[in-house]
Amino acid sequence: MKQTKLTGRIVVPSDPGYDIARINLNLSIPKLPCIIVFCQNKNDVCNALKWAREHHVPFRLRSGRHSYENFSLLNHGLIIDVSEMKKITVNTRNLTATIEAGANLGTVYKKLWKYGVTIPAGTSASVGIVGLTLGGGIGMLSRLFGLTCDQLVEVEIVQACGKFGAKIIRASEQENSNLFWACRGGGGGGNFGIVTSLTFRVHPIQNVSIFSLTWEWKDFIAAFQAWQNWAPYIDERLTSSIELFPKQRNKIEVKGEFVGSPSELYPLLSPLLETGNPSLFIDEVPYIKAVQFFNSGNIPEKFKRSGSYVYKPIPLKGIQIMQYFLSHAPNKDASIWHQSLVGAVENISPNETAYFHRKAIIAQEYITSWKCDVEENRNIR
């Protein structure tokens, strides 16, 4: 049998660019793959999968390098990287966009903005579109339009077939519908194949209103209670987050986006404005400027992140536990972040897609990072 050759841009440990090619966003879990293939098209993906099967080489899939636990890396194996496949095609008549698997959110937002449309997706520009979508995908338009995966029309995916083969298939409501169900929130990492492109419904967008409110540490409990009793239930055009910072930073911050004018937004903020004495920022901007406002500008670092879904308002004791932790945080870079949900997210039943948490009112994430290895235990214990 004729053996398959790897195609695409191939990087091995002896190449000068190997160290840059192998690292992910999280530097605390380094891995040393033996080959990294930067696929240029879906045929390169097929060849990489065939090669791995023929040579019995373990492999991982990678796009945006945002796997928190570096599940997209491995030692002594093959990385099938699709990050250089970035083509985006917009159909303005049907209001759809077909996006190759390597595009990150920054690239997607900029391209779609040229056509006056967008998809509801995340806030970090460097996140890959595929990993986000397969996990569900939340962001500042979630309560108005739903999850990123809710906009999916079709998935193009490479799957293993036969003893050593690979094939390109499509999944939609009409074709391979069970696979399409699984791809909408069933998780990233290649659970069901290697996604090479996604087709989404897109939404017209123009100007939006952005805002932030900031309290001092003394208002920790009152500010969080006010936000969590307001954010999941307010006008669906408004999605917001609250980030709780360590005591040494003396800051609690709410940020949000409203698809409407500042004059409509201001009265909606009353429950927050009446809590303590927050500073307020409001502006009406083109949507692409709002994307920049929320982008956290992630850079590679050593970190640990985990999260949970909240189905009922967190009781006072729970808020006090968060306050206690952040008053004893290992450094100033720890935080607890929350985003409001429900709205359009719950318009789809939990069984209609693989994303189950339709009734969750809040997504919660625990964040910490460190500079030196000796600080690791204090940050992740």
What are these regions (language model features)?
Residues 1-381:
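Soluble FAD-dependent oxygen oxidases
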